């Protein structure tokens, strides 16, 4: 939480004092379960309820920036589910695409968590998956367009199911889909 709140705040304050463009990574995780929608309007920000410490720490900085009235001078980017090359160093925090690729390569099967939410069948849980190069292009656009400031969502704007994503990885690897549903660990339930 220190990295995502205190250190980000200190860096932001330094940038503001020294007239340096400040663009920071917030997260789609700040939206919690999505029941309040995904509007990046400032008026919605105080009402959000993240589900985990990561989302909460990102949300705390968004709230600080809003309350300090500095969102007119900085840019916050709420990245959704970014995937792409060179993720192995992220361990358990790698994208589902990266995990699926490894599972298919080594085991020939993708293991997805069963749904514990009554509105979603197993594998029908949805996320907005955005390719890392598209996320980088968004960052570069904001770096080049200094007149633009505020809090912005960075995603495709379209949700896909876990099953759709797994099938796409199988197709990209030229293999038939083989998906197994496993129980979600208790400590993760209600957190994602």
Segments (PLM) and residue ranges:
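Active-site Tyr-X1-5-Lys
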Residues: 33, 49-80, 99-106
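Short-chain dehydrogenase/reductase
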Residues: 2, 50-59, 90-98, 128-129, ...
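C-terminal substrate-binding subdomain of Rossmann-fold SDR/epimerase-dehydratase oxidoreductases
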Residues: 104-192
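Conserved sequence/active-site signature of Rossmann-fold short-chain dehydrogenase/reductase
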Residues: 30-31, 82-84, 135
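Short, solvent-exposed loop/turn segments at secondary-structure boundaries
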Residues: 87-92, 191-192
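Conserved Rossmann-fold NAD(P)-dependent oxidoreductase catalytic core, especially the SDR/UDP-sugar
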Residues: 9-51, 75
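Structural signature of the Rossmann-like NAD(P)-dependent dehydrogenase/reductase core
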Residues: 22-26, 75-81, 128, 153-154
């Amino acid at each position: 939480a220190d990295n995502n709140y205190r250190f980000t705040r200190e860096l932001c304050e330094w940038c503001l004092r020294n007239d340096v463009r400040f663009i920071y990574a917030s997260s789609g995780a700040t939206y919690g379960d999505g029941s309040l929608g995904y509007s990046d309007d400032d008026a919605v920000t105080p009402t959000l309820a993240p589900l985990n410490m990561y989302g909460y720490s990102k949300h705390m900085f968004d709230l600080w920036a809003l309350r300090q009235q500095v969102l007119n001078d900085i840019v916050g980017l709420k990245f959704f589910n970014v995937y792409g090359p060179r993720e192995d160093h992220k361990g358990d925090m790698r994208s589902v695409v990266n995990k699926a690729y490894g599972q298919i390569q080594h085991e020939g099967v993708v293991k997805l968590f069963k749904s514990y939410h009554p509105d979603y069948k197993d594998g029908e849980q949805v996320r907005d998956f955005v390719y890392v190069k598209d996320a980088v292009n968004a960052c570069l656009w904001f770096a080049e367009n200094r007149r633009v400031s505020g809090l912005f969502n960075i995603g495709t704007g379209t949700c896909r199911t876990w099953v759709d994503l797994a099938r796409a990885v199988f197709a990209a690897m030229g293999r038939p889909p083989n998906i197994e549903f496993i129980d979600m660990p208790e400590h993760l339930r209600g957190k994602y």
